[in-house]
Amino acid sequence: HIIVVSALENRYFSGISLGAMQKNRIHLIHSAFDIIYLILGPIFAAVGIALFYTPAKITSGGASGVANILYNLFGFDLGLMTFCVNLPLIAVGVFVFGLKYSIKTFIGSTLLSLWVSFFGKLTGYTGFLDISEPVNILLSAIFGGVLLGTGIGITMKSGCNTGGTDIIAQTIAHYTPIAVGSVSFCFNCLVVGASGYFIGFQPMLFSIIGMFCSSFMGNYVLTGI
């Protein structure tokens, strides 16, 4: 009887040990994928902004859109402006959502800013397409939006985001019954509308196309992959 009980105890505790090991392995795999997503997401988003949007004077919504307007008006470094616009928004996130959330957001927004500066300086913000052709501006809006939305979606799958006005949208949604998507959409419309005044009406129209493409791809990546 003692031998049987001992064998059962060994099997029980070994089962607990294997279960704990399996949970640790799953946790490590998830953490590895989070890191991969956090690295790849800002790269996709930066390519969309620096190589497609900016050469065609197309503006995304959020902080990167504000940075793009400042870049077109004053010639400030686009990546640096993106980082500077994000900083006070991240500070708001510290008080509302805590330090852990804000650190992740800071990492995502910093990586985005660095990659935007890298690709911008690498190509001089000229991109791959000849923007003197109207069809290429349309292609820039479509492909830039697809890349930007993919990057944002991938980054959010890691539990982070790239900062921007989404922090304000989440803050408003936190204290009111208004949905995050609705607030974010309103902010994006304000930024894109401002680009029509400061940059031009035609780029604003292409920016609207890009905004819908990026929104679609962001939702698809989060729910479909």
PLM features: what roles do these ranges have?
Residues 5, 10-225:
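Core subunits and conserved enzymes of cellular information-processing
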